C-alpha cells in the first residue's frame, strides 16, 4: 500500500528506529534458534522507502527493522529520542540550526561507519535542492525523457517539495565526520521529524561509479566533495542509483551490499512475492537488544488467507485489511490462542481524481476549459456512495465508525470538527445523482463518461467498494471501468488511470504531513493537482507555531481542495492485529506506521525453540 502519507521521507527516517528502557543494547538477549513469522498484505520491493516509488508501508516496515535512527514513535503515540544511536540539538532559533551527531561505533553491517557522508546524502536526496530535471510521462505512463534524467541530477524522493528543501546551504560536517548541522532558511514547525539517515552513502556512490572500484572511505569522500562543490556531473549517477538502485524483489545474491544495514536486523533472504527473511545483526550495540534471532515476513494479500495461515501456525502475527468476514474468522479461531486487537489506525481511505492525463477530469480534454473539467469532477464525486461503503463494509466491524470528511485531519483529532464545518465536504455527504446529471449537462458532456478506476485486485474490501461506486456512478452516466492491478502502487502518478482508491497512512504527528500530497511540487502529489492558494497556505503552515493559526491555514487548504473537486475521503481504517499468544508475546499495536512493528525488540517467542 502506498502510504504513506508514509509521507515525504518519514518512512525512512522517523519511523526507522528502536529503543528499550532498562536493557543493555547488543546481541546478548538474542535467543539462539528463535524465529517468528509475520504476514503482510503487500510484497517488499524496495530497500529505499524514501523514493517516490519505494514510499510504501510494505517497504518501510522492513527498513524499520534494519535501520537505526535519531527518534521513533511509541504506541501513544509519543516521539521518543534514541540517544544510543545519536543526538540532535538546536544550536540557534534564528536561523533555525539543528546539529545531528551519530555516536561513535555506530556502523553499517559491512563495517563502514555511519557518519556525515550518510547524512549529507540524506539531505541532498530528500531536499531535492540540486535536482535540475524531473520525470515526464507519455500517455501509457512510461517515462518519456529518460536521457535527460540520466544526464541530470534527479533524486526521485517522496520528500521533494517538503520542508527539508528549506535547507539550501550545504550542511557543515563536524565532530570528526560524525555530525552535520542543518541551517533552515526559515523557521520550520515540524523540524524534529524532518531528517534522518537512509541508505548508505558509500554503497550508493560505489555503485554509481562501479568502474572505479572505490573503497568505502574513498566513496564517502567522493560524495562529500561532489555535494560541497555542487558537482552536478558527479551527482547525476549518484542520484540515479539512489532513486532506483535499491529496488529489489529477489535477494541480490551477487551484490549483498544492497542490503547493508545499520539497525537491529539484516535482510538475509528475499523471494519474489513470497517472503523476506531478517536475521539479527549481532554487531548491533546502538539500540535496544532484540530477542528474536530470525523474523520472516510472508506476503499474503488475501485477508482470509492470512487468517488461515495464522490458524494453521504458518504465521504468528497478521494485520489484514478488516472486513466483517475477517473478524468472524478470527473469532472462530480464538480457541487456538489467537488474540485479536481492533482499533482505528492512522490510515484513511480516499478517492483521488487525476488532473493531468487528458482524461475526463483534465481540462486538456475540454480545450483547456478548467471550469468544465471541474464540473465533471464534481459530478463524479457526487455519485460516490460514501455512506453505503461505510455502513456495508466498515460499520459491521466497527459500529462507531463515521465518515471521514477531512483531507488533512483524522476524525476525533483536534481541529477536525472545526475544519469539516467549513471545508465544503458537505457537498458530497450524500449521493446526488440528479445533481451529477445537471453538472454534466452544464459541462456540455454527452454520452457515457469513461472513468478508468485503479485499485488493488486482491483486496476484497476495495473490490466491494469499486462495485458500489461503479453501480452508483452509472446512474449519472459514468462508465466506471475496472482497471485493478496487483502492482497498483507502482502505477500511482503514472497518469494511466482517472480515479484511484487507496489509503494514506501517517508516520508522524507533523502538522504539515499532508503537504507532500497536496502541494504542487509535493513528492506525494500523484495526480497533477496545482493550486497557488494551497501552496501559499502550506508555505505559511511550515513556519507557523500558533495552533489556532495552523487551524485557519488548514481550513484554507481544505476549502480549496473541495472547491476544486480534488477527491473525497471515506473512512478511517479499522485496524486489526491478530497473533498467536502461544507462540509470541509483546505485541502492542500502534496507530502510526510502522504499527505493531514499532516495539519489535520487546517481542518474545513463546513455546519450544528448536536450535539449529
Question: What is the predicted role of each segment?
Answer:
Residues 125, 253-256, 283-329:
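Ligand-site clamp/hinge motif
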Residues 397-442, 457-462:
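Structural transition elements
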Residues 88-150, 175-186, 190-192, 306-309, ...:
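Aromatic- and charge-enriched surface segment that lines or borders ligand/interaction sites
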Residues 112-124, 177-181, 264, 344-405, ...:
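Alpha-helical secondary-structure segments
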Residues 138-242:
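Surface-exposed binding/hinge segments that line
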Residues 378, 382, 390, 424-429, ...:
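Extracytoplasmic/peripheral linker and loop segments enriched in polar/acidic and small residues
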Residues 39-93, 101:
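N-terminal lobe/hinge region of extracytoplasmic solute-binding protein
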Residues 38, 111, 311, 322, ...:
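Periplasmic binding protein-like
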